[in-house]
Amino acid sequence: MIQTIRGFRDILPGETPLWQTIERAASQLFEDFGFQEIRLPLIERTELFARSIGEVTDIVEKEMYTFPDRKGENITLRPEATASVVRSYIQHKMYAADPIQKLYTMGPMFRRERPQKGRYRQFFQINAEVFGIASPYIDAQLILLLNELFKRLGLTDLTAHLNSLGCRECRPLFHRALTEFLVSKQDRLCSDCRRRMDKNPLRTLDCKVPGCREAMQDAPTTLDHLCSDCSDHFTTVKATLKAQGVDFLVDKTLVRGLDYYSRTAFEIQTTALGAQSAVAGGGRYDALIKELGGPEVPAIGFAIGLDRLAEVMAQLKGCPAPRGPDLFIIPLGPGAMEKAYLCSSRLNLVGIRSETDYNGKSLKSLMKRADKLNAGHALILDYRQPDKNAPVLRNMKTREQVTLGLEDPTDEVIKILTNEGTLRD
């Protein structure tokens, strides 16, 4: 038997209603906030991610699915979406029409991480990106948007963690202080952190090795080295969130795992899965568009981990039952199956969800199937004695039933179900 590759999985019909609930809520909220959807390829040139995410990161060094195509060019299954959205913004010169763009996208990403609870090698994200606005108020708005989305989904046990990573003006001062600290602790650091000390010291703060985390407890923080502009920016973000009633914690250890972040960085974390884990995160990346060959345009965005969010919701609220049909049509006797098919198809075309039987089963077994499908009504078309047995419409919840005319019952069914107001949304 052929099975899925390790770290990959199927999202089965019993799970997809929950995913659809999240996706619909996100799409509606994004559009309310003025975002437009963009759809992107799953494969990009490897250079895009090496230049944007950073060559000295776990993602680029250890986790990307990279391979040469037939012409020898290195291509990569996208490990995240922001770089692809930026590439599209530059390639299609969206900035020429209007530098301010608010875009969102949904889809699978790929990283060859160690599979564990809530983490897969193919995982799904919901991403939002804003280009062309440097104001701290848009930072606050994106965090507010996330807070509102989770509220609409019925999740309350979540905490926003904030930090500021500084800018090109003040980060070099922090890098020097951090490097000096790392040199004094290098005998306690793992080989990766010792290698990254000179190339990209900020990445050492993201190390998951317990010994490194212990050694880094007294490390310098970005907040202690902010320039006045970055400090004012972060102060405004915090004040705006507080004014809007959004709870948050300032987390000096939060650096995110991607090199392109600057100034505001944030995560939405939960303890619902046991250990503290992030269900969403993002931040500013004001230099990335220029770094990838575009104009100097400020930008900010976030990603929601759809797999992890769905797991949290399933654990806290359970998965919604799959939606049953409004009507299950039971054909009995010669010619009944054709009538049932025609009736079912017509009902589907006018927005009434209906199913029927194509296997010639008995009345008893088909009534059981109507119950199993959680059908709202059953329509019995008994053609065993067509001149005597009129169609019967039964409410599967109340068990009340009504006898219909001998002719095609479709119009009567539409009228009754519409007037009852029992059709499923």
From Swiss-Prot:
<dbReference type="Pfam" id="PF13393">
    <property type="entry name" value="tRNA-synt_His"/>
</dbReference>
<dbReference type="InterPro" id="IPR004154">
    <property type="entry name" value="Anticodon-bd"/>
</dbReference>
<keyword id="KW-0436">Ligase</keyword>
<dbReference type="GO" id="GO:0005737">
    <property type="term" value="C:cytoplasm"/>
</dbReference>
<keyword id="KW-0648">Protein biosynthesis</keyword>
<dbReference type="InterPro" id="IPR006195">
    <property type="entry name" value="aa-tRNA-synth_II"/>
</dbReference>
<dbReference type="GO" id="GO:0005524">
    <property type="term" value="F:ATP binding"/>
</dbReference>
<protein>
    <recommendedName>
        <fullName>Histidine--tRNA ligase</fullName>
        <ecNumber>6.1.1.21</ecNumber>
    </recommendedName>
</protein>
<keyword id="KW-0030">Aminoacyl-tRNA synthetase</keyword>
<dbReference type="InterPro" id="IPR036621">
    <property type="entry name" value="Anticodon-bd_dom_sf"/>
</dbReference>
<keyword id="KW-0547">Nucleotide-binding</keyword>
<comment type="subunit">
    <text>Homodimer.</text>
</comment>
<dbReference type="InterPro" id="IPR004516">
    <property type="entry name" value="HisRS/HisZ"/>
</dbReference>
<dbReference type="InterPro" id="IPR045864">
    <property type="entry name" value="aa-tRNA-synth_II/BPL/LPL"/>
</dbReference>
<dbReference type="Pfam" id="PF03129">
    <property type="entry name" value="HGTP_anticodon"/>
</dbReference>
<keyword id="KW-0067">ATP-binding</keyword>
<dbReference type="InterPro" id="IPR041715">
    <property type="entry name" value="HisRS-like_core"/>
</dbReference>
<keyword id="KW-0963">Cytoplasm</keyword>
<comment type="similarity">
    <text>Belongs to the class-II aminoacyl-tRNA synthetase family.</text>
</comment>
<dbReference type="InterPro" id="IPR015807">
    <property type="entry name" value="His-tRNA-ligase"/>
</dbReference>
<dbReference type="GO" id="GO:0004821">
    <property type="term" value="F:histidine-tRNA ligase activity"/>
</dbReference>
<dbReference type="GO" id="GO:0006427">
    <property type="term" value="P:histidyl-tRNA aminoacylation"/>
</dbReference>
